[in-house]
Amino acid sequence: MEPVTNATVYVVDDDADVRDALAWLLRSRRLYSESFASAEDFLKMVEERALPRQPQCLLLDVRMTGMTGLALFDLLKQRDGFIQTVPVIFLTGHADVPTAVQTVKQGAFDFCEKPFSDNVLVDRIEQALQQSAVYLEETAHRHALLSRLADLTERENGVMKLVVEGVPNKLIADQLDISVRTVEVHRARVFDKMQVKSAVELANVLRAHGQLPQ
């Protein structure tokens, strides 16, 4: 697994010793980190600034004074795509392991029981950052696809729908009451705008992003 570059690891723990130890560990593995002493401080940061479009993950203590890690996680889940962009790894004591298992079922990436092995934790962090990177890439591809679809004219959309259904040019021309040559022109424009070379490739791209015409 290739290490993820330009990544950020957020640490939320009310124990200063834990924050310092994690900051040192992450620095030693050449991972950039930002630490927060409370869930409230992290939530304030999230609300006040846009998160960078780069791989990120969150190390979150389960039990903290004030807002707990569980309460923060519930709030973050309500933000569209947040826990996919910033996978959450819970840091938990032995007594909280059953609770941590439940959070994984609810969308957390993983949990790590204290005291944790440095290598095990860093390995999980790297996996979370990989997942974040994949999600960001897929999201970027989806946005680019939607932008290309929005650039199609109404006629091009009509031709595209029939093309991905496998309808031959002659039948498309008959259905739309246009010439075969006009169909060929629109078909070529659709392929060009959608950056594909065949009807099969076009259908696969649309299907992969849930945009296949009904």
List where the protein language model places each region:
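C-terminal output helix
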Residues: 96-98, 112-125, 171, 175
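Short amphipathic alpha-helix used as the core "switch/output" element in two-component signaling
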Residues: 70-84, 102
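Acidic, metal-coordinating helix/loop segments flanking the phosphotransfer/catalytic sites
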Residues: 35-57
